[in-house]
Amino acid sequence: SDSMVMVNLKLLIHMVGDMHCPSHIVYTKDFGMPGYSLKIKGKKVGRHKFWDGAPQYMHPKWKADRFVKAYDTYTPKEIKKICKGDAYKWSVQNANNILKTGNYWERGAEFTKFSKEQRKQIDETLHEQLAYGGYRLAATLNKIFSK
């Protein structure tokens, strides 16, 4: 039915997006990731809230079209490689990529005092994860609707 298609589309869009967000990857083992929480202008912000809002924290004046221009930088050949595989492969790849984010800052660090290198690391992760998530969602939707 149409309502079932709508529900499935909403779930697909939500899940593909979430699997590319560093705060939505959960490990069964504690890897000692010290960068769990931080402060933004003195207010404690958890890792989850930070990564969900990272695009706005990093680039508060950007609108959606600016993110597209900045992050949609891969060639068609690279996009094809990025979209290879399935959700399981993508999740494993993301979990491995995201493990490094725990060392971007010390627990309780103040975001406004992050170094250029720390901001660069965060922005590189944003670039990759947002682009990969978008490309993979588009590929999945194209696969579904090309039938």
Residue ranges with predicted function:
Residues 1-49, 58, 116-147:
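Soluble secreted/lumenal catalytic domains
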Residues 37-127:
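An amphipathic alpha-helical core segment
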